[in-house]
């Protein structure tokens, strides 16, 4: 009875601490981590205090099954066949070999009978190959040099005809056909006003505005700088992009609401861990409230292993219970 009262007192104190810890930064998360570690400590104490831990392993939910025992007649379980072996070599058909090895040896032995004939044959093949390369090179150069030579001939013919037909050559130099020096074409009356040439440069006010200079992406933030699209003006000093923290006010109320919502999850966490270890704790001789004490105990909890120091039960424990004890 005294043990249960002490467990109730520890639970109430711990729940009060958890409820009051929401005013601290990260307090509720810290207590959740402590709950997880203390639940495992309580499981260790239960396993050490239970005289026959192997009989109650089927009780908790989510307990991994121990590895199956091997029969003496069965071979040892090992990695699957082919594990760790290098891949098989590629087939010979994938390699670009046109002749098998015996034919190569016969070809290499053939020049011994008549040395001059194979050499001449190989030389002729090489000459034909080199001649084909030369023809291909000349054809490529003719394609490139042909338009250049034609353009040069046209330029020379035009330069030679300037002295004979100066007006025609000048008119040919402009795509619109307007004379260069401002002279009127022949046959035009003197009273006719001279029309402006479409090729002449337009005045400055008719020119469209120059496109804005491309600025780096870092400087193109909206509202920064005096140029278009956020770019700095030509004569202005580049400004730094304002931090987003200044634009968005700190939301302290949302954090408080989140922490208040998290306080409701403490009971769910306790119930989850309690259901997972309920099969062990109900059949343990220590009492029914050992689980709650282990979950909610703070600094007042006793050190693990003090309950069952005089019970040698480690010899018949399976790997799952051994792992919990090692924790």
Swiss-Prot record:
Q: What is this protein called?
A: Immediate early response gene 5 protein
Stretch list, region Disordered: 59-166, 227-313
Keyword annotations of the record: Activator, Cytoplasm, Nucleus, Repressor, Stress response, Transcription, Transcription regulation
Biased amino acid composition, Acidic residues: 253-262
Q: How does it assemble?
A: Monomer. Homodimer. Associates with the catalytic subunit of protein phosphatase PP2A. Interacts (via N- and C-terminal regions) with PPP2R2B. Interacts with PPP2R2A, PPP2R2C and PPP2R2D. Interacts (via N-terminus) with RPS6KB1. Interacts (via central region) with HSF1; this interaction promotes PPP2CA-induced HSF1 dephosphorylation, leading to enhanced HSF1 transcriptional activity.
Q: Please name the source species.
A: Homo sapiens (Human)
Which compartments is it annotated to reside in?
Nucleus; Cytoplasm
Q: Name the tissues where it is expressed.
A: Expressed in acute myeloid leukemia (AML) cells.
Record family assignment: Belongs to the IER family.
Signal sequence, renumbered to the chain: none
Q: What does this protein do?
A: Plays a role as a transcription factor. Mediates positive transcriptional regulation of several chaperone genes during the heat shock response in a HSF1-dependent manner. Mediates negative transcriptional regulation of CDC25B expression. Plays a role in the dephosphorylation of the heat shock factor HSF1 and ribosomal protein S6 kinase (S6K) by the protein phosphatase PP2A. Involved in the regulation of cell proliferation and resistance to thermal stress. Involved in the cell cycle checkpoint and survival in response to ionizing radiation. Associates with chromatin to the CDC25B promoter.
* Gene coding for it: IER5
């Amino acid at each position: 009875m005294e043990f249960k009262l002490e467990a109730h007192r520890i639970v109430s104190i711990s729940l009060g601490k958890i409820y009051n810890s929401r005013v601290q930064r990260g307090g509720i998360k810290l207590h959740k981590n402590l709950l997880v570690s203390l639940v495992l400590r309580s499981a260790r104490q239960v396993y050490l205090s239970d005289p026959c831990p192997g009989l109650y392993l089927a009780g908790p939910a989510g307990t991994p099954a121990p590895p199956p025992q091997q029969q003496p007649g069965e071979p040892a379980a090992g990695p699957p066949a082919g594990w760790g072996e290098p891949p098989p070599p590629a087939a010979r058909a994938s390699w670009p070999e046109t002749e098998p090895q015996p034919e190569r040896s016969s070809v290499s032995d053939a020049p011994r009978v008549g040395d001059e004939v194979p050499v001449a044959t190989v030389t002729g093949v090489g000459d034909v190959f080199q001649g084909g390369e030369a023809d291909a090179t000349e054809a490529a150069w003719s394609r490139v040099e042909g338009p250049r030579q034609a353009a040069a001939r046209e330029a020379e013919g035009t330069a030679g005809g300037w002295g004979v037909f100066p007006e025609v050559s000048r008119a040919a130099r402009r795509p619109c056909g307007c004379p260069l020096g401002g002279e009127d074409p022949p046959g035009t009356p003197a009273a006719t006003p001279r029309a402006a040439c479409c090729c002449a440069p337009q005045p400055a006010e008719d020119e469209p505005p120059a496109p804005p200079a491309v600025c780096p992406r870092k400087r193109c933030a909206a509202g920064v700088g005096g140029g278009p699209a956020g770019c700095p003006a030509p004569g202005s000093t580049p400004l730094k992009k304002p931090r987003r923290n200044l634009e968005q006010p700190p939301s302290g109320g949302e954090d408080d609401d989140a922490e208040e919502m998290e306080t409701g999850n403490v009971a769910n966490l306790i119930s989850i861990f309690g259901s997972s270890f309920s099969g062990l704790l109900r059949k343990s001789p220590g009492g029914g409230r050992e689980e709650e004490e282990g979950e909610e105990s703070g600094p007042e909890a006793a050190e693990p292993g003090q309950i069952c120091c005089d019970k040698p039960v480690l010899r018949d424990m399976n790997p799952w219970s051994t792992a919990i004890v090692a924790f």
